[in-house]
From Swiss-Prot:
It comes from the Bacteria. It is found in: Cytoplasm. GO terms for biological process: chaperone cofactor-dependent protein refolding. This is Co-chaperonin GroES. InterPro entries: Chaperonin_GroES, Chaperonin_GroES_sf, Chaprnonin_Cpn10_CS, GroES-like_sf. Together with the chaperonin GroEL, plays an essential role in assisting protein folding. The GroEL-GroES system forms a nano-cage that allows encapsulation of the non-native substrate proteins and provides a physical environment optimized to promote and accelerate protein folding. GroES binds to the apical surface of the GroEL ring, thereby capping the opening of the GroEL channel. It holds the Pfam family Cpn10. The keyword Cell inner membrane does not apply. It comes from Buchnera aphidicola subsp. Pemphigus spyrothecae.
């Protein structure tokens, strides 16, 4: 992938959702839903604070994150794969093992 996000933006590859219910029923279409988890594939340089300082992002490439797919989320196809471009503030949590 040849794309570099700017400022406090993050590029995420959405993780696949489990397509079976707890009872073993295969879910399809909208019933399966879309995952709000993904892997960070690229990060911007950081956010410029009011005093002009650059604050590095808290997430890094390879982090598994839970995100809010709000109005600011942009879905982009890159090399025939779907990625989300979000601001770091759209990320709700980092999943730690």
């Amino acid at each position: 992938m040849n794309i570099r996000p700017l400022h406090d933006r993050v590029i995420i590859k959405r993780q696949e959702v489990e397509s079976k219910s707890a009872g073993g029923i295969v879910l399809t279409g909208s019933a399966a839903g879309k995952s709000t988890r993904g892997i960070v594939t690229a990060v911007g340089n950081g956010r410029v604070l009011d005093n002009g300082e650059l604050k590095a992002l808290d997430v890094k490439i390879g982090d598994t994150v839970i995100f809010s797919e709000g109005y600011g989320a942009k879905i982009e196809k890159i090399d025939n794969e779907e990625f989300l471009i979000l601001t770091e503030s759209d990320i709700l949590a980092v999943v730690e093992d």
